[in-house]
Amino acid sequence: MLLALGLTLVLYASLQAEENSFTINSIHMESLPSWEVMNGQQLTLECLVDISTTSKSRSQHRVLFYKDDAMVYNVTSREHTESYVIPQARVFHSGKYKCTVMLNNKEKTTIEYEVKVHGVSKPKVTLDKKEVTEGGVVTVNCSLQEEKPPIFFKIEKLEVGTKFVKRRIDKTSNENFVLMEFPIEAQDHVLVFRCQAGILSGFKLQESEPIRSEYVTVQESFSTPKFEIKPPGMIIEGDQLHIRCIVQVTHLVQEFTEIIIQKDKAIVATSKQSSEAVYSVMAMVEYSGHYTCKVESNRISKASSIMVNITELFPKPKLEFSSSRLDQGELLDLSCSVSGTPVANFTIQKEETVLSQYQNFSKIAEESDSGEYSCTAGIGKVVKRSGLVPIQVCEMLSKPSIFHDAKSEIIKGHAIGISCQSENGTAPITYHLMKAKSDFQTLEVTSNDPATFTDKPTRDMEYQCRADNCHSHPAVFSEILRVRVIAPVDEVVISILSSNEVQSGSEMVLRCSVKEGTSPITFQFYKEKEDRPFHQAVVNDTQAFWHNKQASKKQEGQYYCTASNRASSMRTSPRSSTLAVRVFLAPWKKGLIAVVVIGVVIATLIVAAKCYFLRKAKAKQKPVEMSRPAAPLLNSNSEKISEPSVEANSHYGYDDVSGNDAVKPINQNKDPQNMDVEYTEVEVSSLEPHQALGTRATETVYSEIRKVDPNLMENRYSRTEGSLNGT
């Protein structure tokens, strides 16, 4: 019933609000006591709203509080002021706040206000134990319950009464606490742990005050070791030296300890599962020095040190020698001595072999005597050895041999291995390769194996070896090795001795040459586009020739040549560039050809002209012969010509409508040798304008051609007969 009544009132109020007009005048926030507060203080954020309305009663509105754009509190109210209370402000409460008022479909939001909380609350420190044994572990719990993670924790381990921090651990936790383990060391006695918490606020880390834990008491697991030295007091070489290290172990230790005795850094004695370790040795001066005793468990190590001095009974012997380097056959003389000349027992040794039990030793040196020598001197139980003396006995080198590894002829620029070897003589051996009497390369070998040098000769060369070793004899020389080098052909060139333009009929000489090459050299001459050479020559020279005594047009073209020798590649031979040769005719030949051509042209023209006139004459003779019979032809003396081959025709006038003239040779077939005079009859018809129609004028013209002796000029006589109008 009450719920229904409340809903009715709310509905009524909302309906009233919809009917009334309102406006949100302003909205802002205030912070109490301030926008900046200390950690743990109460913080009150107020949202103040100013609303105007036509209603007589206050309108109901909604107020929302935001921190960093996330809503943290909201309330429905009719009041002008609403508050958001934080009882104890913490660092995580720092941020940007704003509030929003909502009334029906209208809302308004304040600007953002920044809240800062300074300081971090104190953390809490707890320990899992207050008493611990050396080598144990203490677990420290540092927590900050009031703050929100992530939290930065810093925990330190300190010795009570000092400010020295023995260990520090930093850790960022995503929880508001952290658990850290601290091992307990041998130097720890009474400990305290200190914890400090930090929280990142914006870009600044705010830290709490450091909080100290309760005290932790540390108990020893074992004591610091102690030394016992026997004999006490002065220790002399030959005495029996006892060095004893003693440790007291408590019942709380669950791990086995190890005791170690060291001289300098060398371990001389150890003991496990015991409370002591002993080092016993006959005292010698070299055993003097700094001794350390260490007691170690899994995590704990304790140590103490002592200085032991041993008095020398007699000094170390010295081995004297004539020379450390002897030639084979020289005297090897050794002597062992002790400073102060005490009575002692001596031995002279080579490595581990005793050569003499006396103070001196001599012999003729052999190469096998090379090695390290020493001597000993003994008084009572004390025996001392001298330092090692290296002695080398050198055998003289034999004459070295010299040879090369080439299996065939040596080609210019190719590598060749030249070896030097002395089969006898003490190593190491130094070989010097001499090239053209000058030092070229040096090699040292540690055996009698050959020393191999590498060279790339470019011409015939002489090599010699010089060998040397530790022997005092001067260096020995090998024989001279002469190396013959063959050079492949290089830069093939083809040329012509005269000009590239050769006159026909003159001599033509081609030359093929190389810049360099070992003879014999094979030269081959080629003409372009021909697979086989037209000339080949094998000569002991760097050039070859091809001669042609009379050049013709056939020799015109492109030429090249190749050259090869023993050093050339089997696949290809070096080739020259191409040479162009042109052959031209001699001037007199050109003139002769011109004369012949002109004569042929003239003869052709004469024959053509003669044929032309003969055709024309025949063409005219045919109509004349058809018009009238032939008449005998009279000579100049009115004599009849009687040769049967001569045909004389006399022409009379006839009607020629077309008016064409006709010409016919008279004695065409007569033998030219028997005929001195030839006649040609020409008829000319003309029509005079004053004559009547049907009257025709005819004129006959005879041309006489007389043939005379060829050496004389040809005489021509002409005779003309004519009759006009019957005259």
From Swiss-Prot:
SUPFAM superfamilies: Immunoglobulin. Residues 710-727 are annotated as: May play a role in cytoprotective signaling. A lipid is attached at residue 611 (S-palmitoyl cysteine). Trans-homodimer (via Ig-like C2-type 1 and Ig-like C2-type 2 domains); trans-homodimerization is required for cell-cell interaction. Forms a complex with BDKRB2 and GNAQ. Interacts with BDKRB2 and GNAQ. Interacts with PTPN11; Tyr-702 is critical for PTPN11 recruitment. Interacts with FER. Interacts with CD177; the interaction is Ca(2+)-dependent; the interaction is direct. Residues 40-126, 135-213, 225-309, 315-391, 413-472, 488-578 form the Ig-like C2-type domain. A motif (ITIM motif 2) lies at residues 700-705. It comes from the Eukaryota. One of its GO terms (molecular function) is protein homodimerization activity. InterPro entries: Ig-like_dom, Ig-like_dom_sf, Ig-like_fold, Ig_Fc_receptor, Ig_sub, Ig_sub2, IL-40-like_Ig. The gene is Pecam1. Residues 18-590 are extracellular. It is a single-pass type I membrane protein. Pfam families: Ig_2, Ig_C17orf99. This is Platelet endothelial cell adhesion molecule. Residues 698-718 are annotated as: Membrane-bound segment which detaches upon phosphorylation. It comes from Mus musculus (Mouse). Disulfide bonds join 47-99, 142-195, 245-293, 336-375, 420-465, 512-561.
